[in-house]
């Protein structure tokens, strides 16, 4: 029975990821005053299926000097971790209701760095390695602020369980009392998922294609799936943290619809940002985090810790 539950979680995620690629190409197309994919199927709706078929029936090439086992393990690990992170997400009921769900999410997102590092190193190519090192530095850096922002938000809900956030936000979304945190969180999620304007790992102008430059066919598709699964997951996480939908135990479907619409709007904003902004310079990216975000988030974290103590109201404990 548990396997059926797992499949019922994974299959819709993969479908959502497939159609997100189409939505992205369509949105970017219309923003550049062109149509986007419109040949395969009505309005290009079958494009993701054609793409998947094309990628998975191609020959998976690999460089002669590459480390074979690690070269193959890296994309599999990337997708596995991307899908594992969906386990504690309440939609409105999680697959496994973990006591330390948020800690689990942080741990998994940190492990995802390894797949990028291994792929760059195992390719035995200088461009792939530089791309991987950039990605690792960027991901690790932005995880610092993500963790501090999470801590500040959790002080308002009083529990590491994600489901508690739904109850906390019954009357007020947490984006209102903590909007500076929400803004920094959103920008950090962009950097964490390697999206424009932070897609320095895939700097086409200088690094060809970043850490996955030597990948082709199936393994490349797995990296692609992992990236887009992470984008949707991060937006769902953002919705849970800051834009909690109203949950009626008798009508959980209403919650799911409300929740999905918010997550989709956030995902569309990711695409909109990609169409609108040029890429950051690497030193600017690091400067933004270490000199701007980190001091601000630390100050706000101190504020969120001291406020309840000052008002003699300890954080809610569940």
Swiss-Prot record:
Its EC number is 7.1.1.2. It comes from the Eukaryota. GO terms for cellular component: mitochondrial inner membrane; respiratory chain complex I. InterPro entries: NADH_UbQ_OxRdtase_su1/FPO, NADH_UbQ_OxRdtase_su1_CS. Core subunit of the mitochondrial membrane respiratory chain NADH dehydrogenase (Complex I) which catalyzes electron transfer from NADH through the respiratory chain, using ubiquinone as an electron acceptor. Essential for the catalytic activity and assembly of complex I. Core subunit of respiratory chain NADH dehydrogenase (Complex I) which is composed of 45 different subunits. This is NADH-ubiquinone oxidoreductase chain 1.
